[in-house]
């Protein structure tokens, strides 16, 4: 049921308090659809409902459904290998074991997966980098869009689901915020959020039985990214400010192949194109991946992204080529129709000429620390999807594991929340804007946003050094001070909220990177090129201003 305003902002009927889900992508919709049969749910989107990052996912979703050629053990092994020693094996196994059921659930919802009558479950399975078997269910090359449209239609039709567009959460409301005296004597709990109704320019106080963060990653902290404008790390930043730990924030995955074109700098060229035989070449036609990894184009993303970055810098290139012309026109149009159409609209016929590609920030492998039910350190607060650290991705995410994680953990979170009793709610104060005024110059926000994204790209990118990281941290702290001062004196806007969150996440990324004195997975340091025999996740704790479980850091 679509709506422009929550039906229960502060209700006298506490037994009917809704569950508030912040984010309307696959993670949020999975939780909502699994819970809505038993209780009311609000799903909040800060832009239009169709603008979630899920809709941008091309490749597919992992499913161990081919029992003849594939197995859970094989999927787990591939996940462990890609994750470079930091994957929690029990997490990887749990999610792999649930993968077939996740695919079945999507089929039951009506997702029109590309079919193959001879394939397991009647599905055409493709293969992507890092996978030893064909196990990727897909909808041509627009899997995320198809899944998102189906689930969004289901949510729109459900009487117990209220969908909000153009609402953005500012901060979580916890009992420690309500009464500072209880901070040391009473466990902290989340009771709701302050959220900006963007269309009406008004901040509301929203009570909730539980809050679920399904806000996605932080790709917009970088100048070049495959992510939509929604990827500003809102959930990670809010959870951190509320007292939750975050893990492995240094591991930002750069997708190896985003289209290089002046008119379209965020269009991703799916991993599946290399999985089906696409070749990486220098502009002179020379292949180069064999010099970097024996798996060539099928190496994990971190290796391929670094290889492309190395070759671009070595030869002074703006891009390299991804050549799929040898696959044939019919094959390309059947398996990659969206990529073909987008490139044709830009004057590039990929059946006859190679695609110019560059790496771009793509996926946040760390985030809010949760268990396998999505529970965070804060009672009443859950997190699901790219905003989280569950241990699945380790130091590098295996292709197409992300959509799977959203469904498996989302389903588990829904079950756990459904078992909870509605808490005794305190009186939540209204948002106070009596001491602030309308912003005088938006150029401050625009300038600081541009500066942040540039310094993160130049100093905290694919290859890092301590000097670059320290410069970045120094500048980020200055920007945070400026933005916090602005936040305290002027009325909030979406751009201000997002910039505040991006700066919070940028500092977490840099601090985590400085703590990792080795090169592993997505984190490559020229100062520490070696890899330890044993390593641990980087866990930052708000109260301790950052700690690591690694005794060598």
Task: Locate each region found by the language model.
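N-terminal Rossmann-like FAD-binding beta1-loop-alpha1 element of flavoenzymes
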Residues: 19-43
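Short hydrophobic core segments
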Residues: 20-22, 206-215
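Conserved N-terminal glycine-rich FAD pyrophosphate-binding loop of Rossmann-like flavoproteins
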Residues: 47-78, 84, 253, 264-267
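An anion/pyrophosphate-binding glycine-rich loop and adjacent beta-alpha core
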Residues: 238, 244-355, 416-423
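Conserved redox-cofactor binding core of oxidoreductases
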Residues: 107-202, 214, 258-261
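Glycine-rich loop(s) and the adjacent beta-strand/alpha-helix scaffold that form part
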Residues: 210-267, 314, 401-412
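Short beta-strand to alpha-helix junction loop
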Residues: 87-100, 135-153, 164, 225-233, ...
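Glycine- and aromatic-enriched mobile tails/lids
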Residues: 2-9, 14-18, 34, 40, ...
């Amino acid at each position: 049921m679509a709506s422009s305003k929550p039906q229960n902002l502060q209700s006298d009927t506490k037994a009917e308090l809704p569950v508030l889900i912040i984010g309307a992508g696959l993670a949020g919709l999975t939780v909502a659809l699994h819970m809505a049969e038993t209780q009311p749910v609000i799903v909040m989107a800060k832009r239009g409902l169709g603008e979630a990052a899920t809709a941008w996912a091309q490749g597919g979703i992992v499913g161990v459904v081919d029992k003849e050629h594939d197995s859970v053990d094989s999927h787990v092994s591939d996940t462990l290998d890609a994750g470079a020693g930091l994957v929690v094996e029990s997490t990887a196994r749990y999610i792999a074991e649930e993968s077939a059921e996740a695919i079945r659930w999507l089929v039951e919802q009506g997702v029109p997966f590309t079919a193959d009558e001879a394939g397991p479950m009647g599905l055409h399975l493709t293969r992507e980098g890092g996978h030893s078997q064909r196990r990727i269910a897909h909808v041509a090359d627009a899997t995320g869009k198809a899944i998102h449209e189906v689930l969004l239609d289901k949510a729109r039709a459900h009487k117990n689901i209220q969908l909000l567009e153009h609402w953005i959460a500012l901060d979580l409301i916890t009992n420690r915020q309500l009464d500072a005296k209880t901070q040391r004597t009473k466990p902290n709990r989340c009771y709701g959020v302050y959220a900006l109704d963007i269309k009406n320019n008004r901040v509301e106080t929203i009570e909730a039985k539980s809050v679920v963060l399904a806000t996605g990653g932080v790709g917009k902290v970088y100048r070049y990214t495959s992510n939509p404008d929604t990827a500003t790390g809102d959930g990670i930043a809010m959870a951190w400010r509320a007292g939750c730990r975050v893990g492995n924030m240094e591991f930002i995955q750069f997708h190896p192949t985003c289209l290089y074109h002046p008119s379209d700098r965020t269009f991703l060229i799916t991993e599946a194109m290399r999985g089906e035989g696409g070749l990486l070449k220098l502009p002179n036609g020379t292949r180069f991946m064999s010099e970097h990894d024996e798996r060539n184009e099928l190496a994990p993303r971190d290796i391929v992204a670094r290889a492309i970055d190395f070759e671009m810098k070595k030869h002074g290139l703006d891009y390299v080529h991804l050549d799929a012309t040898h696959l044939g026109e019919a094959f390309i149009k059947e398996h990659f129709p969206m990529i073909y159409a987008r490139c044709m609209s830009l004057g590039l016929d990929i059946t006859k000429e190679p695609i110019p590609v560059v790496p771009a920030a793509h996926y946040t492998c760390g985030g809010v620390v949760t268990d396998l039910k999505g529970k965070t350190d804060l009672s009443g607060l859950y997190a699901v999807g790219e905003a989280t650290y569950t241990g699945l991705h380790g130091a590098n995410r295996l292709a197409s594991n992300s959509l799977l994680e959203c469904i498996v953990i989302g389903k588990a979170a829904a079950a756990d929340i459904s078992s909870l009793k509605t808490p005794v709610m305190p009186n939540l104060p209204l948002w106070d804007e009596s001491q602030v005024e309308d912003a005088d110059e938006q150029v401050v926000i625009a300038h600081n946003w541009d500066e942040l994204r540039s310094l993160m790209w130049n100093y905290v990118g694919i290859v890092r050094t301590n000097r670059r990281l320290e410069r970045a941290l120094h500048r980020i702290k200055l920007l945070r001070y400026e933005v916090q001062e602005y936040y305290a004196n002027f009325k909030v806007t979406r751009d201000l909220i997002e910039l505040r969150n991006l700066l919070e996440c940028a500092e977490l990324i840099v601090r985590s990177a400085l703590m990792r004195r080795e090169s592993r997975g997505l984190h490559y340091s020229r100062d520490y090129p070696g890899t330890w025999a044993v390593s641990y996740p980087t866990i930052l704790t708000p109260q301790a201003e950052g700690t690591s479980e690694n005794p060598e850091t």
